[in-house]
Amino acid sequence: MAKTLFRGPVLQGKFNEGGVTGFNLEAKEANYTVVNGDSGKTFTSKTKDVVFTLPAISIGRVFTFVNTASDGTNNLTISPNANDGILYAGSLTDDKDIINTQATSKVGDYIVCASLNSTAHWTVVAVQGVFAKES
């Protein structure tokens, strides 16, 4: 019997088909600028080199980004607003990206960014896979 192997979050919800509102999963296959109204959504991407640009900090926002491409085929980039940074793995990267590189990417790799109580940076609150900080 064939085995299905998947690592990553359980994707709950429905994709928005036909412009209906109220859905929390969105597949993006081109660069996308996230807006505060997207808070709570899970964005998926299986296309190489997609960049998700986070909005300016607004406390209480949470966004999830999932690599749904085959292993080793996708770069998934999370980019903060030019005035903000991302706190990840114990250090702050001011106006620098967090990247799930093609060489290390696995299907199901994900990162969750939240604006907890800061007006200066996003915080990575959950991650699976190898995400590198832009130098």
PLM feature spans:
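Glycine-rich, low-complexity segments
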Residues: 2-37, 85-88, 124-135
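Detector for repetitive beta-architecture
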Residues: 3, 14, 31, 40, ...
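Short, well-ordered helical secondary-structure segments
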Residues: 21-22, 30, 41, 65, ...
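Short carbohydrate-recognition loop motifs
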Residues: 38-44
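Acidic, glycine/polar-enriched metal-coordinating patches/loops
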Residues: 45-135
